[in-house]
């Protein structure tokens, strides 16, 4: 049986998509016969989780401190494969769940509408010592003298490493992101969610609304400003449009509530706050929208496809590679409000929306976005690396 060390900074699933993805990855690796163990800097130890820096006083462990602890652990414990989501050149595989640090910095800055502020953000990113340390470690890992394979979650991520670091293509394996498709909410869960919305919110005054779900914890980066502006265009073009934007996430909504009111669409944008069961929200809405400025391969969009929901996102989202524009939903080159409005208008048409749903089912996108498929491809990469080691 192959043994694998999975390196991650923290283990708490509540922290976000990367931690949840690793938890699902661990479960599926073990299901497929890999003896996997998480090596974390911080978190809660468990049977298959070793926490190596629990004696450190700070919440965020310095990369160099974690590296020293890892090398000490690996000297005493053998693993066939060392698979890291952090940029350590001693790893066999580097799987950057957030894409490349350089691209993340650039696109985060690009998400600011004020050009001066965007330029300021490009400069000040380098004042973040941890982020800068990770960027330099990533650059070092990509040097021609190193051998670590980058397991990219999308072709979008692959192109980042080629463009920013001139990394050779033979050191990149594109293994599209995957999710646990068996945790999707049931139709009944979705109906309960929808009924609650239609009964307890402004939706009760509108017959047959078409609900577009936006879900994120960083509203600016994920394009909520653009989504609201696109709703203004939709309502200006079609005052009787059935479109509603349903916003889920833990970010502060204040500025976006003000924006919606200033643009005259406050009755068309509903803010729900953080959702304990996002699957029910996906199941209860008609489509999903994420006009993001940056996402290596969004779990939210994959979960929507697994639930047979049409999706709208941008080329800055690696998940856009998992479906076809105009067939399963719509792909916008960048967060353009006019194009977003066109996509919303199109999916307000029942026939168009149903055609997308049927195409998603027919093309079996649910299996395509599964963690089972993802781990199967990852296992193949493990086998290749082990063969080369024996070589």
Per-range role (PLM):
Residues 41-43, 215-219, 243-257:
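Glycosyltransferase donor-sugar binding loop
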Residues 121-153, 174:
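Membrane-proximal helix-turn-helix segments that form the acceptor-binding/catalytic region
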Residues 151, 205-222, 228-231:
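Conserved donor-binding/catalytic core segment of Leloir-type glycosyltransferases
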Residues 156, 178:
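Carbohydrate-associated surface elements
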Residues 185-204:
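A short helix/loop element that forms part of the nucleotide-sugar donor recognition site in Leloir-type
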Residues 274, 293:
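Aromatic "clamp/platform" in nucleotide-sugar-dependent glycosyltransferases that forms part
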Residues 310-313:
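Short hydrophobic beta-strand element within catalytic cores of glycosyltransferases
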Residues 325-326, 330-337, 345-351:
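Conserved acidic donor-binding segment of nucleotide-sugar-dependent glycosyltransferases
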């Amino acid at each position: 049986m192959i043994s694998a060390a999975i390196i991650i900074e923290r283990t708490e699933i509540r922290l976000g998509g990367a931690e949840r993805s690793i938890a699902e990855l661990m479960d599926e690796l073990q299901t497929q016969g890999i003896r996997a163990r998480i090596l974390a800097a911080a978190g809660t130890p468990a049977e298959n989780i070793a926490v190596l820096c629990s004696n450190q006083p700070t919440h965020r462990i310095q990369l160099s401190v974690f590296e020293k602890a890892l090398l000490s652990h690996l000297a005493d414990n053998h693993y066939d494969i060392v698979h890291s989501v952090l940029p350590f050149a001693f790893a066999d595989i580097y799987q950057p769940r957030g894409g490349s640090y350089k691209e993340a910095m650039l696109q985060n800055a690009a998400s600011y509408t004020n050009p001066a502020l965007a330029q300021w953000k490009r400069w000040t990113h380098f004042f973040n010592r941890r982020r800068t340390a990770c960027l330099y470690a990533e650059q070092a890992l990509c040097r021609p003298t190193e051998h670590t394979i980058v397991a990219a979650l999308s072709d979008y991520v692959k192109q980042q490493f080629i463009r920013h670091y001139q990394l050779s293509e033979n050191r990149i394996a594109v293994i599209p992101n995957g999710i646990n498709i068996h945790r999707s909410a049931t139709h009944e869960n979705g109906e309960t969610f929808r009924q609650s919305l239609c009964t307890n919110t402004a939706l009760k005054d509108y017959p047959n609304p078409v609900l577009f779900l936006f879900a994120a914890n960083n509203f600016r980066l994920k394009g909520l400003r653009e989504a609201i502006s696109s709703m203004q265009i939709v309502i200006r073009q079609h005052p009787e449009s059935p479109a509603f934007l349903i916003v889920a996430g833990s970010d502060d909504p204040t500025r976006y509530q003000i924006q919606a009111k200033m643009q005259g669409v406050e009755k068309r944008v509903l803010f729900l706050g953080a959702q304990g069961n996002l699957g029910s929200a996906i199941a209860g809405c008609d489509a999903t929208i994420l006009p993001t400025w940056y996402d290596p391969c969004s779990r939210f969009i994959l979960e929507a496809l697994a639930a047979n929901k049409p999706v709208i996102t941008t080329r800055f989202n690696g998940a856009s590679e998992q479906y076809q524009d105009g067939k399963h939903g719509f792909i916008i080159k960048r967060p353009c409000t006019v194009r977003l409005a066109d996509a919303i208008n199109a999916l307000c048409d029942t026939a168009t929306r149903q055609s997308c749903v049927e195409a998603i089912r027919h093309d079996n996108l649910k299996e395509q976005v599964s963690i089972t498929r993802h781990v199967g491809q990852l296992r193949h990469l493990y086998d290749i690396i082990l063969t080369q080691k024996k070589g």
